[in-house]
Amino acid sequence: MTKAPKPAPDIATLTKAKAKVEAMRLRLEIERHNSAYYQHDAPTVSDAEYDALRRRLEAIEAKFPELVSASSPTQTVGAAPARGFAKVQHAVPMLSLGNAFADDEVTEFVERVQRFLRLDAVPSIVAEPKIDGLSLSLRYEHGELMRAATRGDGFTGEDVTANVRTIADIPTTLKAKTIPAACELRGEVYMLKQDFLALNKRQEEAGDTVFANPRNSAAGSLRQKDVAITASRPLKFFAYAWGEMSDYPMDEPTQFKMLGWLKQAGFVVNPEITLCTSVDDALAFYRRIGEQRAALPYDIDGVVYKVDRLDYQERLGFVSRSPRWAIAHKFAAEQATTVLEKIDIQVGRTGALTPVARLQPVTVGGVVVQNATLHNEDYIKGLGNDGSPLRDGVDIREGDTVVVQRAGDVIPQIVSVVLDKRPADATPYHFPHKCPVCGSHAAREEGEAVWRCTGALICPAQAVERLKHFVSRLAFDIDGLGEKQIVLFHERGWVKEPADIFTLQARNAALKLEDIEGYGETSVRNLFAAIDARRTIELHRLIFALGIRHVGEGNAKLLARHYGTLDAFLAAMRAAAEGQTEEGNTSEAYQDLDNIAGIGEVVAAAVVEFFAEPRNVAALDALLAELKDVLPAEQARRDTAVAGKTVVFTGSLTKFTRDEAKAAAERLGAKVAGSVSKKTDYVVAGADAGSKLTKAKDLGVAVLTEDEWLALIS
């Protein structure tokens, strides 16, 4: 039985060792939320919770600056671009903004600017509503739109040029009299509230997924692979900034003057933007916009203040992930009181059990709210993400009168309970330890707040994502069987678990795949041939394909090399699963698994949870019955010049593909890493190597060309 996480200790009492562990936990959690927000357009926590996580991490790193790393979320922006779009390097990074949550913090921001610039008077400040949408960068050359990219991680975004050309607010040709030879113009893609409601109504009527809020709908609409879908969505754009400028279109440019030029160039600029000459003016604008917020046709989550003079901006510069010359003043969440009628459990595509409050309908900030996220078991019990008391430790029960808020216009959540209205018969909520969809047992890892269904191979709620993973490039990699086909076959009930893929041909007399639009006898024959070709598979690919939590490609290879053969692996996993008790696992098989270099307790526990679920074992047995052979692991050599060394490949390689280089290095006993650190022994740099090469040089890591690498391993 997994224990609930202990409350996080006060930062002032942390030792360096404990601070390192806590910082790592916070980084992983923040990175998960970044990925959900930036890559999948599906925020998993409120702005307030996210900000609390960031502030705790920032406080730890401030106390222990030696723990700060370049990859920390406090030093980076957003999340890496998704794989479905071409990558675009921003000529000037698209950084995020620091946040202020109180008037005093805005005053402190202005005072910092004055001290830095050694000014006696407050500099002019541009105040603008903070649009809750998707940041976009538009590159124009000689006035013509050449490329559009999302923010991504701030340095590399996604190329969405074709989709952006369908947005009426974005000119394909600049109209201003004076136009720079090259410029990157930036702003926010958003959707009007009324358009969002109409879109969700159409989605619901069509049986399609509805969006949580206008920001999600705008981001999801822009990041469509089918341009026609983007064109059908009512997307808008406000321009408010720029990146690279070959030259400015005026003498002595300022932020406010440049906004006027953007209007001349053909962009829509928010008419609410105001030039302020004092802190009081800026705060008055904040309060006025806050009062008008519900009546505005678009969602905003605060106000952005920017120093007006561009020469001041240049002198102020940046700190890691944000500019010194701008700050976002966030709004307090909007709240209302209602009754929580029921708590339901939803199972996500990755198996997470998420509690949802079903509420008596109530209007919050002009929007009718009927559901609110309860996040996890601890949140219901009255514990925050760090284990500290939340809502003064008051739990949430069915029948309670609760205060609901829309934090940052994202996902409604319950922030407090009106205890004097609690029904006498209201009982504490008991979080289910079984999946409500498939009945498999649920597990909660130590240090995490989420319960997850362990029926990875058989749970209908997870089926599509698990099957996509099963056929992915690093797993079974079946030619002609990708995400689109998996979704189609699953929707028709033909493929529910991995073994079903290998019985398609035997069932085709009844299924008749060749009758599906886009298929024919030749394509079906090729598909069956590709499936048959994967009836023989390498052990590490099979392990990776199972989709066990925390078992990526690297850990799958570690497991395969340790056990060597399928029989040895299965025997050890079943023995370890049989040794699982509520008190822990002291079996010899589990101890052996836990002691594998690079595996550790978290991964070992996840593997055992997988094999402790009988339905997973049954699904795996059904799969193995369809396979011809599982090839033993190729053991890494220990007698080479790179055995035990950590290697990073970067840039465009010409003598081999990245996968070939990685496989060859691993066969020779090297560990291939994805990022450069002090522990890196070699960086093999191809053409156009970027930040990894720079970091390697800064750290004094040995840098090799492809030829030098080949000479080393020959």
From Swiss-Prot:
One Gene Ontology CC term in the entry: cytosol
Domain of life assignment: Bacteria
MF annotations from Gene Ontology: DNA ligase (NAD+) activity; metal ion binding
NCBIfam families reported in the protein's UniProt record: dnlj (TIGR00575), PRK07956.1 (NF005932)
Binding site residues for NAD(+): 47-51, 96-97, 128, 151, 188, 306, 330
Record's catalysed reaction(s): NAD(+) + (deoxyribonucleotide)n-3'-hydroxyl + 5'-phospho-(deoxyribonucleotide)m = (deoxyribonucleotide)n+m + AMP + beta-nicotinamide D-nucleotide
Coiled-coil positions: none
Cofactor(s) this protein requires: Mg(2+); Mn(2+)
Record-linked PANTHER family: CHROMOSOME TRANSMISSION FIDELITY FACTOR 18 (PTHR23389), DNA LIGASE (PTHR23389:SF9)
BRCT domain boundaries: 637-714
Lineage of the species this protein comes from: Bacteria, Pseudomonadati, Pseudomonadota, Alphaproteobacteria, Hyphomicrobiales
UniProtKB keywords: DNA damage, DNA repair, DNA replication, Ligase, Magnesium, Manganese, Metal-binding, NAD, Zinc
GO biological process terms held by the UniProt record: DNA repair; DNA replication
Protein name: DNA ligase
InterPro entries with a match to the protein in the record: BRCT_dom, BRCT_dom_sf, DisA/LigA_HHH, DNA_ligase, DNA_ligase_AS, DNA_ligase_CS, DNAligase_adenylation, DNAligase_N
Function: DNA ligase that catalyzes the formation of phosphodiester linkages between 5'-phosphoryl and 3'-hydroxyl groups in double-stranded DNA using NAD as a coenzyme and as the energy source for the reaction. It is essential for DNA replication and repair of damaged DNA.
Annotated family: Belongs to the NAD-dependent DNA ligase family. LigA subfamily.
EC number: 6.5.1.2
SMART domains, sorted: BRCT, LIGANc
Active site: 130 (n6-amp-lysine intermediate)
Originating species: Rhodopseudomonas palustris (strain HaA2)
Binding site for Zn(2+): 435, 438, 453, 459
